From Swiss-Prot:
Species: Haemophilus influenzae (strain 86-028NP)
Ranges for domain YrdC-like: 1-183
Protein name (database record): Threonylcarbamoyl-AMP synthase
Pfam families tied to this protein: Sua5_yciO_yrdC
EC top class named in words: transferase
Family: Belongs to the SUA5 family. TsaC subfamily.
EC annotation from Swiss-Prot or TrEMBL: 2.7.7.87
Catalytic activity annotation: L-threonine + hydrogencarbonate + ATP = L-threonylcarbamoyladenylate + diphosphate + H2O
GO CC, one annotated term: cytoplasm
């Protein structure tokens, strides 16, 4: 499928696969509880874990992140350029769905400059959920063909290439700089 078709599927609250910096991600509209539930069911992912959101700019995260709790130094860390994709744990707004935050009062976000992510966010007007495109016990998909093999020939997948990152994103807490996952 092309970008416009995938964007329309996202607007229709479907779960789609799209390329990110290292692997294909499964994504949906984070403001649609039904879409997020479909994603969690598909991945067999416990709601308590929460999800990562990706977007090309901070504006896409405004509905979810409590920016009033982020100081200027932390904001510059958040917007910094890093050698590897970096996901930040940040304060969530109290109105952010527990389907996104899990059992936490924070949410995981990543500024992503991958052209596919940027285009989909701009076409839809919202950030995307991002969890690796793979079934439990299977390796993350690195091509659209691998997505189709794991999820079926009719699964909506953006047939573009992943970035050149070798590993999933590093995950750090913005307030403490604690490392949760090495990238």
């Amino acid at each position: 499928m092309n970008r416009e078709q995938i964007a329309e599927a996202l607007r229709q609250n479907q779960v789609v696969a799209y390329p990110t910096e290292a692997v294909f991600g499964l994504g949906c509209n984070p403001q649609s509880e039904s879409a997020v539930k479909k994603l969690l069911d598909l991945k067999q992912r416990p709601v308590e874990k929460g999800l990562i959101l990706v977007a090309p700019s901070l504006d896409f995260f405004r509905p979810f992140v409590d920016f009033e709790q982020i100081n200027d130094e932390q904001l510059s860390h958040l917007q910094g350029k890093y050698e590897r994709p970096t996901t930040w744990i940040v304060p969530a707004k109290s109105t952010t769905s527990h389907f996104l935050t899990g059992k936490f009062d924070s949410i995981a976000i990543r500024l992503c400059d991958h052209p596919s992510v940027k285009a989909l966010c701009e076409l839809t007007g919202f950030a995307l959920t991002s969890t690796s495109a793979n079934l439990t016990g299977e390796p993350p998909c690195r091509t659209a063909d691998e997505v189709r093999l794991q999820f079926g020939a009719d699964f909506p997948v953006l047939d573009e290439i992943v970035g050149d990152a070798r590993n999933p994103s590093e995950i750090r807490d913005l307030r403490t700089n604690q490392l949760f996952r090495q990238g």
